[in-house]
Amino acid sequence: MNKIFAAFKPRGLSSNAFLSTLKKKYKNKKAGYSGTLDPFAKGVLIVAFGQYTKLFRFLKKTPKTYKATLWLGVYSLSLDDQNIKEIKNIKEFDLANLQQIIDQMQGIISYTPPQFSAKRINGTRAYELAKKGIEANLKPCQMEVFDCKILSYNHPFLNIEITVSEGAYIRSYCELFARKLGINATLSSLERIKEGKFVYNNEKSLNVLKYINLKPNFIKDLNKLENGAKIFVEELKFHDEGDYYIETEKYFSIINIKENTVKYLLNKVEKC
């Protein structure tokens, strides 16, 4: 079964554990997901079955939009509502001051991922090491903040909606935001509501060709695709270098054009 859809991962489960429940639900062992969510987070997770598991690298998965609640005055080792070491009653902030910092934190931001994150260190998730008291050597990264708005502020809780690039960590954004206020802060909730064009819709099966980040190309002799025969660049409508998809009624293929040579990246993928 080929299927791609947006699932809703609940809080408290790792992305792998959640995928296992979907494998059982749909009785399909060949499954995968893209865009790992930490156990603390909930929300949209892109899931694929069958041949569609090979398509993740072609999907347009940015920007990503989250809803987050910042708990001001709280110090947590994991930057969430676990591993809390200190809670301070701090003075309420002026909303205009908070908005000013939100506005300052637009564009490219440098950060170090939190120890309790899904980053892999030699094959092991950083949060698994952190649970054992092992500090991972996490390299500095960059994220881009496209937009951020305050939804509500009921001190000490600040609710925001933020749209970011792939690879961004909202907990790190929270940490940097708090630093500008001169306080500690942590997240009390985090939900991904959108990943690229993917939004949760009751696990409805999607037309993958509307979600891949590729241009269509065309060939007169579609039998070549059906048979996996060699394709020459002169037979195609578009000759510019790059990746394309070509579809027939039942199948599609993904090709690459480079130096006037056509190469199959994926061939004869059955439409769902």
From Swiss-Prot:
A biological-process GO annotation: mRNA pseudouridine synthesis
Q: Which cysteines are joined by disulfide bonds?
A: none
EC no. given is 5.4.99.25
Give any GO molecular function from the UniProt entry: tRNA pseudouridine(55) synthase activity
Q: Does the keyword Protein biosynthesis apply?
A: no
Q: Does the keyword Transmembrane apply?
A: no
Question: In the UniProt entry, which residues are flagged as the active site?
Answer: D38
InterPro entries in the record, alphabetically? PsdUridine_synth_cat_dom_sf, PsdUridine_synth_N, tRNA_psdUridine_synth_TruB
List the coiled-coil residues.
Answer: none
Q: Which reaction does it catalyse?
A: uridine(55) in tRNA = pseudouridine(55) in tRNA
Keywords, in A-Z order: Isomerase, tRNA processing
Q: Which HAMAP family match?
A: TruB_bact
The UniProt similarity line reads: Belongs to the pseudouridine synthase TruB family. Type 1 subfamily.
Q: What is this protein called?
A: tRNA pseudouridine synthase B
Organism of provenance? Campylobacter jejuni subsp. jejuni serotype O:6 (strain 81116 / NCTC 11828)
- Phylogenetic placement of the source organism: Bacteria, Pseudomonadati, Campylobacterota, Epsilonproteobacteria, Campylobacterales
Instruction: Provide the gene name from the record.
Output: truB
